[in-house]
Amino acid sequence: MKCFKIFDATLRDGGYYTDWDFDNQIVDAYINAMNALPIDYLELGYRNNPTKEYMGKYGYCPVSVLKHIRAISTKKLDVMLNEKSTKPEDLDTLIKPLVGIVDMIRVAIDPKNFDRAVVLAKAIKSMGFELGFNCMYMSRWLTDYPDFLKKLNQINGVADLFCMVDSFGGMTPKELTTIVKEVRVNTTVPVGFHGHNNLQLGLINTLTAIDLGLDYVDCTVLGMGRGAGNLNTELLLTYLNAQQGIEVDFNVLGDVITAFTPLYEKYRWGTQLPYMISGANSIPQKEVMELVTNRAYSFDSIVRGLQNRKDHVKDNAKYPILETEKFDNVIIIGGGSSPVEHLDSIKAFINKTTSVALVFATARHAGLFVDIDVPHYYCLVGREAKRLKNNVSADKFKGVCVLPPYPRKLGTDVPDYAERTTFEIRSLDFTQGFEDSCTALAIQTALNVGKGNIYVVGYDGYPGSILSEKEVTLTNETKTLFRDYEKHTGEKMKSLTNSLYPELEVESIYQFL
């Protein structure tokens, strides 16, 4: 018989991937499975004041949703509040309607706000709920918050749980043991542990917590959770069944895994090198997750940016400012299929046009133009340095590489053969907020080196009415940049090939031949 309680936080922590939207069938399958498994509490999501950012059903946990789950669940239920965005005067709206529906309110707390959090906790406790005090940034407590642990006696008689949160996923069993001893010296409140899996230590840290006699541990189905995720519920239960004889219905456990597998296949949470680096160096999961899920950033660039941060440097390289040569005609080459389809005509146009330069927003088609004897400018953002190396060999390279302004968020990568002919722009003048955009860098480069016509090819747009999330994001970004160009110059950008972007003015290349 286990002498500790298990929180399953799948819907709350997993919501960081789904924006807290879960299909009703998945939730019902989850609740039914949890009813048959040795789980004590289900953490269903957040209660929040209205925010500008979208949060789905389990980001707000409407009362009607909680009532439905209360009716079908045999487990204790809890929801979480963020202390930083919750004041005592909000509680009548946020949690008073939950009396008799949920059993515990857990509050996410930054140690620096401990005193303020105690006031909030007392107000919550007075409403009759069990209270969980979830304190973040555990790996920094002894270094960054030296007085924090000494204050824990203030929650005696208030909190029913003091949960230690390894926010960065970098704790070791030895460090965990040290902190548990310090915590127990300072409070009589039952202690819990919520781990993250950046260094694949979620299981061993949780087992260490159990061996140390902690009262609560957290887990999630398939480890679903922010960034690198959490300890897998199925892994913990399998171990406890084998080692402690805790009864587990593995058919039910398999069913809930099956229910969440499509979400895993879609979002692919779990640790990988960027999360490992962030865990080992206590870098916030939120920041790394935003990088890993961003279409523009290569794996190498994320690792490089994290390494720069670890080394406390702004960027790993700095280059001279791009000189503003002035060409009468500049052609920006994008990544669509039209440069391939109209290659001969584009080359003919270039050959008959005087004072012309090519700016490659992406190196995808760069190899097609190495035989054209005009200046080439290659924009290097994200994965483009690697793409350039793949498409243009050292013996064929005759151009200039262009980088965004210094310092670059994720560091700098330049092909070895281009080191001597690499420059950076001083600033992004025609738009704001797109420092990591290939198209933004290409347009600014064209403005810097051109004095007349600026054309594009390869900005075809995506056909069809149903676009992927990546295509929608890229389309919206590109539209914004074309509109910003028009505001900056007073005229639309001209496309020499057909395009679905209404922000472009199409002038068929064939009229010039």
Regions found by a protein language model. Give the residues of each.
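Catalytic cores and adjacent flexible loops of soluble metabolic enzymes
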Residues: 1-328
